[in-house]
């Protein structure tokens, strides 16, 4: 069904495949710098703002609670409670 290739034909085929692969790899690296993607003009276009987001005062503290770790929830709850006056 398939024909056996001669040594020179095998060498030519391997060289052609290598050259084609090298050409496409080089083109893949070079073309984005020559023809930049028009969708990437502003890198912040795909960010979404939180609908409940409000501008915070300059000296305010933000506490981030990690839901996966029980230790961080404990630390955050201690930070939220003001110290008791004795």
Swiss-Prot record:
Per the record's keyword annotation, is Lipid metabolism included, yes or no?
no
- A cellular-component GO term for this protein: mitochondrial inner membrane
Subcellular location(s): the record lists: Mitochondrion inner membrane
Please provide the Gene Ontology terms (biological process) for this protein: mitochondrial cytochrome c oxidase assembly
* InterPro entries referenced in this protein's UniProt entry, alphabetically: Coa2
Keywords attached to this Swiss-Prot or TrEMBL record, sorted alphabetically, are:
Membrane, Mitochondrion, Mitochondrion inner membrane
| Entry keyword Signal | no
User: Principal place where this protein is found?
Assistant: mitochondrion
- Pfam families in alphabetical order: COA2 (PF17051)
- How does a null allele present? Elongated cellular morphology at division.
**What is this entry's stated membrane topology?**
Peripheral membrane protein
Q: Which family does it belong to?
A: Belongs to the COA2 family.
Q: What is this protein called?
A: Cytochrome c oxidase assembly factor 2
Organism source for this protein?
Answer: Schizosaccharomyces pombe (strain 972 / ATCC 24843)
């Amino acid at each position: 069904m398939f024909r056996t290739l001669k040594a020179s034909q095998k060498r030519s085929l391997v060289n052609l495949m290598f050259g084609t692969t090298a050409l496409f790899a080089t083109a893949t690296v070079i073309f984005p710098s020559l023809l930049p993607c028009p969708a990437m003009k502003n890198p912040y276009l795909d960010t979404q703002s939180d609908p409940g987001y409000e501008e915070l005062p300059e000296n305010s503290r933000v506490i981030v609670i990690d839901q996966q770790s029980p230790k961080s929830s404990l630390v955050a709850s201690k930070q939220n409670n003001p110290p008791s006056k004795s």
